[in-house]
Every structure is written in structure tokens, then in C-alpha cells.
Amino acid sequence: NGVVKFEGTSLMNGGDGLLHSADGAFNKFTFGTYIYISEWVDGAFLFKKMDGNSTIIAFQMGATANSLKLSIGSSVATVTTPDLATGWHYIGLTYEQGTAKLYVDTNNTAINFVGALPNEIPNTRTDFLIGDKFKGYLDETFVSSLVVGTSGRNPITFDNWNNSKILAYWKYDDATKPGKD
């Protein structure tokens, strides 16, 4: 029913509990969303967790259209995607013990990121920010503690067992409560 619009000057705060656990560092997760890019902006963040100027984890747009990068600590991996610059697309970023993959639309064949990443995400409690510098729209954004790729997309659904593994899910359907999950 709704989407969230970013115009490059605002962001959404998902709270400081995402990708952080009292049980220890995360070594796998999925970030998924439907995305419509109005303008490709080098360095725009789909999401980030920063501690001051230090990157905990960040997923952002690259210098050229259809290039994306994932940063964990000081390590960076990149991927070139099919045409994300036009129309609506589903993207699913999966990370498991240093291996990052990107799923686009209904293609169950992942695109592998190039570059070495650590086996775990630093377990730092800091805000999970969505959309910083991003120009476009997001719909049905989620974070899961499982590697799910394109499972359950269109619309995004989760079976009963997977419900307990969803860390956050924003449908953006309530205009009176933006960012409600």
C-alpha cells in the first residue's frame, strides 16, 4: 500500500539493535528490499552502521551506475548488477562468514561480490541507518538473521519458522507512522 521516499537529504533510523547481539557477532544475515532508484548517487547508503567515522557495516551505491559495495570494518567488496537504474527491482544482499552475494529480481542465481570480507560483523551497538544520500523509493525492507536470497519475495512473506529469524521488516503502509515495523 505504501513506499518510503528518500530525496538524498534524510534517512531512516532502524535502531541500534540490528546486527548486534548479546550472544556475539553476526556471521550471517540478509538485507532485502524492493528498490526504485530516481538518481544514481555515488556513495549513497542503502544502509549503514557507523561508530563515529568508523564503518561497522555499510551497503552503498558505487561510482558508476549498477555498481554496489559492501564494507565491513575496513574491508570492501564490490558487485556489478543488472540494470538497477530503471524501474522497480527486488534486491537481496546475503552475507555468510565473509561471503557476500546479491540476488536481483526473480533470479535465484546470485551475483558474487568481489573482495575479501571478514568472517563476522563487528558487534558494535550503533544505529542501523537506511537511505542516507539515497534518491529513490524503498518498499518492504527487511533484515533477517538467515541467508534467504529471493525466498518469500513478491510479496515478501516468511513461513512460521522464519518469522522468528526476522530482525526487522518495514512495509511502509502507515503514513502516520513512517518507519513503523
Protein language model features and the residues they cover:
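Extracellular glycan-recognition modules
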Residues: T9-K69, T99-A100, S145-G152, S164, ...
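Short structured motifs
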Residues: M12-L19, S74-V79, L129
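Short hydrophobic/aromatic patches on beta-strands that form ligand-binding or substrate-lining surfaces
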Residues: T30-E39, F47, I91-L93, I130, ...
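Extracellular glycan-interaction surfaces
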Residues: N1-S10, F31-V41, I56-E120
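Extended recognition patches within non-cytosolic domains
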Residues: N1-V3, T109, V114, Y137-D181
